Amino acid sequence: MEDRKRQTRFITDLSCTFGATPDAPRSGKITSLSSTGCFVKTKAMVTKKQPLYLRIWMPENRWLRLCGAVNYNMEGVGFSLGFTANGDEERADLDRLLEELRGQQTAVAT
């Protein structure tokens, strides 16, 4: 089994949209977030390994656009998304968001 680096994740309630195309037509809530992925609460169906576009509504009232692939799906609950090839600007925005969350709450090791 591949050894995975442990990441700090934060419990959140961030609005998001997602989908197979960049316009990301489906909506959900991000309930946990780390530098490597998130969990999206939604009733929408996705499949394991499905590539998705994700848009997170940032505190400064703009979208953070990320790409990822579904790790697993819990039918009627939501799915885990692992972030994939994202640009330097998107990674920097995600890091800033995580730092803001770090200041607001206690992190949970995963």
Regions found by a protein language model. Give the residues of each.
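Short boundary/loop segments of OB/S1/cold-shock single-stranded nucleic-acid-binding domains
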Residues: 1, 54-55
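N-terminal helix initiation/capping motif
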Residues: 1-33, 95-110
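Short, charged beta-turn/beta-strand-edge "cap" motif at the junction between a beta-strand
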Residues: 57-62
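Residue-level recognition of conserved beta-strand positions in structured domain cores
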Residues: 42, 56, 68, 82-85
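Short strand-loop-strand
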Residues: 12-53, 78-80
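Short beta-strand-centered aromatic/proline hotspots
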Residues: 27-29, 66-71
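Short solvent-exposed strand/turn elements
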Residues: 6, 44-48, 81-99
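A residue-level detector for short acidic-glycine micro-motifs
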Residues: 20, 32, 70-72, 85
